[in-house]
Structures are given as C-alpha cells and as structure tokens.
C-alpha cells in the first residue's frame, strides 16, 4: 500500500504518530481511515491541556458515511490542536499526513513510542 509513509508510527485503530523531538508527537488519522470514512464533514478534537492515556477517546470524525472515534495512540498531554479542521474537516481527506493532522501530545513516557507499529506492520494490519 503506497499511502503508508515509512517515517511515521501507527496503531491498529488507524491513527498515525510523527515524532517531532523533545517528547512531542503529532497525531492524525491514516489515509486508510479517511478512505474508509469517505468525505469528512465534522471533526471534534480534544481540549488543549487534556491528559490522555493510551487508547482514550480523543475526538470524533464524522463523514457522509459514518462516525468514528479517534483514539490516543500513546499517553500524553494535548499541547495543541489543529483548529483549522473545525472549519475545513475535508483537509483530512486531501492531506491526512500533512495539513490534516489532529493534535500534538507531550508524551508521558517517550519510550512508549517503541510499542507503536512501523509502516510494514501497519500495512499488514490493513492488508
């Protein structure tokens, strides 16, 4: 599958994680997730300052076909959210790994990154 960037980490619930350094990561949903959802029409993001455990609900994505929860792929405190998605949720369809990012986390334990899937393992998940 060509839409799985090798420089990111992933979880089976279709979120991606980009290591920004200094214990900060950017989180979004994968190309596969947005493809399954179809045209995204609404996004609910977590609150800045919210502390999320791995697997916690961190938002909602609604499309013309379905609604889906977004989960925290790793434990951390929400530092920033992509407020542009509130007025332009379709950005996730157009650029899920770039301008369509959801939120940034300050990790509780940066070593937790080792438990995430690499691109090859995620490709097997969605295979």
From Swiss-Prot:
Chain positions found as N6-lipoyllysine: 65
Cofactor dependence: (R)-lipoate
A cellular-component GO term for this protein: cytosol
Gene3D superfamilies per record: 2.40.50.100
BP terms from Gene Ontology: glycine decarboxylation via glycine cleavage system
Pfam families registered for this protein in UniProt: GCV_H (PF01597)
Lipoyl-binding domain location: 24-106
UniProtKB keywords: Lipoyl
Annotated cofactor note: Binds 1 lipoyl cofactor covalently.
Protein's job: The glycine cleavage system catalyzes the degradation of glycine. The H protein shuttles the methylamine group of glycine from the P protein to the T protein.
Oligomeric and partner information: The glycine cleavage system is composed of four proteins: P, T, L and H.
Family designation: Belongs to the GcvH family.
Descriptive protein name: Glycine cleavage system H protein
Gene this protein is translated from: gcvH
């Amino acid at each position: 599958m060509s839409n799985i960037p090798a420089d990111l980490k992933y979880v089976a619930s279709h979120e991606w994680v980009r290591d920004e350094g200094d214990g900060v990561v950017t989180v979004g949903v994968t190309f596969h997730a947005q493809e399954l959802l179809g045209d995204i029409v609404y996004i609910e993001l977590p609150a800045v300052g919210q502390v999320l455990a791995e697997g916690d609900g961190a938002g909602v994505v609604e499309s013309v076909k379905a609604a889906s929860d977004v989960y925290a792929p790793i434990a951390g405190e929400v530092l920033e959210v992509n407020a542009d998605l509130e007025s332009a949720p379709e950005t996730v369809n157009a650029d899920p790994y770039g301008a369509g990012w959801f939120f940034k986390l300050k990790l509780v334990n940066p070593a937790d990154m080792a438990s995430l899937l690499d691109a090859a393992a995620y490709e097997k998940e969605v295979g």
